[in-house]
Amino acid sequence: MKLAFLIDPIAALDPTHDSTVALMEAAQLRGHEIWIGEISDLSVHVGEPLGLLRPLKIEPVQWLGDRWQVANPWFTAGEAKRRSLHDFAAVFMRKDPPVTTAYLYATYLLDLVDPKKTRVVNSPEGLRHANEKMYALQFQSVVPRTLVSSNKAEIRAFLDELRAAVLKPLGGKAGEGILFLDPGDRNFNSLVEISTQQGQLPVMVQQYLPEAKDGDKRIILVNGEPLGAVNRVPTGREFRGNMAVGGRVEAVPITDRDREICAAVAPRLRQDGLFFVGIDVIGGYLTEVNVTSPTGIREIDRLNGVSIGDQTIAALEALVNQG
């Protein structure tokens, strides 16, 4: 198959951590042809979706038991050519968040891809629908108590009821802007005013789960099925476990409760065309559903001796072959 990946600038990607690289590497190892571009390389000509794309060859990284071995250079990209997206069996939309105006417009261009000819992963409509904070609220049986509001008095009352909470910007990523709220914090008003832009933007306020100190579990789902998990544990004085803010990773099993959560969300994920997803679970509760560019493949592979990328591409092959 020919596969196109819409990514961030490839020279800025870390091949030992980036899940997009892991997916492209797995696809190449399975014999597929890889092409790359950025969302600014998309266009539509007389109704035909096009991309200014480059063929890519990757030198696979190797885990040596205590470190990654990476070739220098680890990739070779060929000459850019303007190609119809219908030349590809699938197009992976792997631009990292935040969801900007440019990102949103790219999904509109990808709407012009005929799903009978080419599968877009994840679905552009699904990407627009699934705000990574709000999407989880559809599944009330498995989420912690949550308020979404821009009203300071309402947030204050909810915090007083909970005694401790976590505030999350609705457009944040990788733990950015997440705050721990304590009823006794004299900075409460300022924190809420800054986060809501003086009451103009809603934020999510979620019950603080004490189990967060033991880790934030990332579970990778492919076509609704859980393939693997990694635990991200806060370090030092940081209460967030995100890898981007220094959280350490450790192996963790997928529990029966995790499978209950996955079973609750899977039908909606499939309905919305969300093929590759990372959900976050703390203390047996679903806290986020990550759909734009979920990470965690390299860490799960390294800790468990598996290849989530290979399993993902195999699942894609099965879908494409079904037609």
Curated annotation (Swiss-Prot):
Binding site for Mg(2+): E288, N290
Domain of life, per lineage: Bacteria
Cofactor(s) in the UniProt record: Mg(2+); Mn(2+)
ATP-grasp domain sequence ranges: 133-317
NCBIfam families: glut_syn (TIGR01380), PRK05246.1 (NF003573)
Similarity comment text for this entry: Belongs to the prokaryotic GSH synthase family.
Protein name: Glutathione synthetase
